[in-house]
Amino acid sequence: MSTPKDMRYSKEHEWVKVEDGKARIGITHFAQAELGDIVFVELPEVGAEIKADEPFGSVESVKTVSELYAPINGTVTEVNEDLDDSPEFVNESPYEKAWMIVVEPADAEEIENLMTSEQYDEMTQED
C-alpha cells in the first residue's frame, strides 16, 4: 500500500490529515502491519487535551499492546467510535475507516514540521 501524499507523518507512525482546519489522526499502514491483527483500540474522550510526543491512547493486537503518540498538540473534537466495535478497520483501512481522533490543533504550524510521505517512506525503509 502506498503512503498517501496528502498527509503528514510522525516518527511514531501516526498520520495527520488536515480537513477544514482540523487534524484527523490515525496510524499508518506500516504500523498496523507491524502490529498484526488489531483486537482493541483505546482512545481519549472528546475535549481531552493531547500533547505532542505523549501517549493519547493505545492499540492492542494479538501480538502486543502499543501506545499511540500524539503527533501535535491540541484538543480532541471527535473520536472514531466505530473502532469500539470494529477494531479490525485499523488493519483493513488505516487511512480511511480507521481514523482515530480529530483534533483542533493548538498550532497549525506543528503539522508542517511532520514528515512528508516521501520522508516517511524513507524512514520506514531504513527500519
Curated annotation (Swiss-Prot):
Its cofactor is (R)-lipoate. Keywords: Lipoyl. Binds 1 lipoyl cofactor covalently. InterPro entries: 2-oxoA_DH_lipoyl-BS, Biotin_lipoyl, GCV_H, GCV_H/Fam206, GCV_H_sub, Single_hybrid_motif. Residues 22-104 form the Lipoyl-binding domain. CDD domains: GCS_H. It holds the Pfam family GCV_H. PROSITE patterns: BIOTINYL_LIPOYL (PS50968), LIPOYL (PS00189). The modification N6-lipoyllysine is found at K63. One of its GO terms (biological process) is glycine decarboxylation via glycine cleavage system. GO terms for cellular component: cytosol; glycine cleavage complex. The keyword Cell inner membrane does not apply. HAMAP family: GcvH. The glycine cleavage system catalyzes the degradation of glycine. The H protein shuttles the methylamine group of glycine from the P protein to the T protein. Is also involved in protein lipoylation via its role as an octanoyl/lipoyl carrier protein intermediate. The glycine cleavage system is composed of four proteins: P, T, L and H. Belongs to the GcvH family. This is Glycine cleavage system H protein.
